[in-house]
Curated annotation (Swiss-Prot):
UniProt keywords, alphabetically: DNA damage, DNA repair
Name of the protein described by the UniProt record: DNA mismatch repair protein MutL
UniProt family annotation: Belongs to the DNA mismatch repair MutL/HexB family.
HAMAP family referenced in this protein's UniProt entry, alphabetically: DNA_mis_repair
A GO CC annotation given for this chain: mismatch repair complex
Organism of provenance: Pseudomonas syringae pv. tomato (strain ATCC BAA-871 / DC3000)
Length: 645
């Protein structure tokens, strides 16, 4: 064996490595900076932690001042209970909190913050000053940290009851982190979004935001339905509530309320989705999956639903201590929560009918306005009156221009010769042209606007594609193929639900390789697969045999579908893969069976289609998410012709 000798420089390097490998206690500042890597990602992360502390303190008004998107300055001031002078040093210490005392408190925590590390992390990467005063204190106190050990320095200050936290020069001592920040507008958009989420979570708190000296957001306390709706409109835009369904349901200790946008108000990005669990804004895969399922049949490809939903559940049934940012939660019974959310939203969207989308009540009959020659217009259809002096104008008689009409005053215009049609004959021709079609009489139409169906009565068909109808609000345009496709699709789904998913045994069972966890999951949910039309048998630790598949499925699709269902069952405790696949097949059948373009329909057939739409779930969209009808009110039509301007 040959001995390897190290020269002097190599030995020194080896000794250095050995010395570096020794375990040492990190300084408090370095430890906090490491923790800040998880908690403080950008200015929006800072504002989230500070707002949570303000809300937990019982604040009813929060003022936020920001400069350069929070990178230069971020100041939060509240009127909460404040912090006593004795507790101020602990407020900036790691793992120090007033919100929990033991594990039982953690398992039922209702406060937004509880980890006791936010202020310590922020103060390690920025210049932080905290000033506070309690209601029973004679004066306020201020605390700052300094040095490698982050020693707290407390001194008297002037401040009303409440707390102010001032954060300056974010990431001044960690320039590498600062390089990852985006443009000022991007960072402010993230910060603004956090504040909007907090404002939606707490209607009872006033929020005021200023950026670079300019007021950006000013929201007063909202204690009634009108004020809450006003706040939602201010944050989500006025169009949201106009195109949203209010929902509220409570069952088995689960309470869900809020607003879900109609499919016609979908977005190209998922930027108008707010979900709160016990007042905490969360982003959860289980919730996203339930919402996606509920909207599955009514959203166009690539579109995202809109919603503001508040979910309330026993605190012991949800774990909020999943991630330092507290964005994620874990439900104790995820499947029950998933099914509750999906079922509630699915029913709410299914109950939408044209009358809901038209805004409810029929508009009151307007005062008759003058028409015809007196108003400078033609008369209404069937009563078009032509002035005698026009029809009886002498042939070749010039229209004399007023004297002094400028350079063209000597020009005279002679109209083309007319045939001299008598007035009575012309009026008779117009009456015949506008006479009602055979089979439709005025007596068959409703006598009052309240008797008119939501989609009204058909007037005509355009290019064999669209139905034109009149309702109490104005003109209705219907894509007849898309509408009939939805009607057929819903009827096929009902028939399938009544008959169930019948299974077809395979002559030769097919084996599928899975993981041991997937095989265990298949055994645990064997009845679920049976309801879906499958018959599975475990052949080994990592092998399943497929003995029966749903009758409508092809054998080649069975393996992939079983794998997808298993993945869903392990992730969410439930799966809709088979149903979704069946719906695709039914949708194809409905598409091929629906009325095709260029097919001429009689008026009674068009009216029959309109009545079917009014009584069909989700009739506002076809199977692919495209709208099936639209409304043009009288005001919209007046704008096209510049009436009333």
């Amino acid at each position: 064996m040959t001995d390897l000798l190290l020269d002097g420089s190599e030995a020194d390097n080896a000794q250095t490595v050995l010395n570096a490998a020794r375990i040492e206690l990190l300084s408090p500042r370095l430890a906090n900076q490491i923790a800040a890597g998880e908690v403080v990602e950008r200015p929006a992360s800072v504002i989230k932690e500070l707002l949570e502390n303000s809300l937990d303190s019982g604040a009813r008004r929060i003022d936020i001042d920001v400069e350069q998107a929070g990178i230069k300055l971020l100041k939060v001031r509240d009127d909460g209970g404040g912090i006593s002078s004795d507790d101020l040093p602990l407020a900036l210490a790691r793992h120090a909190t007033s919100k929990i005392r033991d594990l039982e408190d953690l398992e039922r925590v209702m406060s937004l913050g509880f980890r006791g590390e936010a202020l310590a992390s922020i103060s390690s990467v920025a210049r932080l000053t905290l000033t506070s005063r309690t209601r029973d204190a004679d004066q306020a106190w201020q605390v700052e940290t300094e040095g490698r050990d982050m020693d707290a320095r407390v001194q008297p200050a002037a401040h009303p009851v409440g707390t102010s936290v001032e954060v300056r020069d974010l990431f001044f001592n960690t320039p590498a982190r600062r390089k990852f920040l985006k443009a000022e507008k991007t960072e402010f958009d993230h910060l603004h979004e956090v504040i909007k989420r907090m404002a939606l979570a707490r209607f009872d708190v006033a929020f005021h935001l200023r950026h670079n000296g300019k007021t950006v957001l000013s929201l007063h306390e909202a204690h009634d339905d009108t004020a809450r709706a006003r706040r939602v409109s201010a944050i989500c835009g006025p169009g949201f509530l106009e195109q949203a369904l209010p929902i509220e349901i409570e069952r088995n200790g689960l309470h869900l309320w809020g607003w879900v946008g109609l499919p016609t108000f979908s977005r190209s990005q998922a930027d108008l989705q707010y979900f709160f669990v016990n007042g905490r804004a969360v982003r959860d895969k289980l919730v996203a999956h339930a919402v996606r399922q509920a909207y599955r049949d009514v959203l166009f490809n690539g579109r995202h639903p809109t919603f503001v939903l508040f979910f309330e559940v026993d605190p012991a049934a949800v774990d909020v201590n999943v991630h330092p940012t507290k964005h994620e939660v874990r439900f104790r019974d995820g499947r029950m929560v998933h099914d509750f959310l999906y079922g509630t939203l699915h029913r709410a969207l299914g109950d939408v009918r044209p009358e809901n989308q038209l805004g409810g009540s029929v508009p009151a009959a307007a005062e008759p306005r003058p028409t015809g020659p007196d108003a400078g217009e033609f008369g209404p259809q069937g009563e078009m009156r032509l002035a005698n002096n026009v029809l009886e104008q002498p042939q070749g008689e010039p229209f004399a221009r007023p004297a002094g009409g400028g350079s063209g005053s000597g020009y005279q215009y002679s109209p083309r010769p007319t045939t001299g049609v008598p007035v009575a004959e012309a009026q008779s021709a117009y009456r015949e042209f506008f006479a009602p079609l055979p089979g439709t009489t005025p007596s068959a139409l409703p006598e009052s606007p309240s008797d008119i169906p939501p989609l009204g009565y058909a007037l005509a068909q355009l290019k064999g594609i669209y139905i034109l109808a009149e309702n109490a609000h104005g003109l209705v345009l219907v894509d007849m193929h898309a509408a009939h496709e939805r009607i057929m699709y819903e009827r096929l789904k009902i028939a399938m639900a009544n008959e169930g998913l019948s299974g077809q045994p395979l002559l030769v069972p097919e084996s599928i390789a899975v993981s041991q966890r997937e095989a265990d999951c298949a055994e645990e949910h064997i009845t679920t697969f049976q309801r879906l039309g499958f018959e599975l048998q475990r052949l080994g630790p990592e092998t399943l045999a497929i003995r029966q598949i749903p009758a409508l499925l092809k054998q080649a699709e069975a393996n992939r579908l079983v794998s997808d269902v298993l993945a869903d069952l392990m992730e969410y405790g439930t799966s809709d893969r088979v149903q979704a696949h069946m719906n695709e097949l039914l949708g194809t059948m409905a598409c091929h069976g629906a009325i095709r373009a260029n097919r001429r329909l009689a008026i009674p057939e068009m009216n029959g289609l309109l009545r079917d739409m009014e009584n069909t779930e989700r009739s506002g969209q076809c199977n692919h998410g495209r709208p099936t009808w639209t409304q043009m009110g009288l005001s919209d039509l007046d704008k096209l012709f510049l009436r009333g301007q």
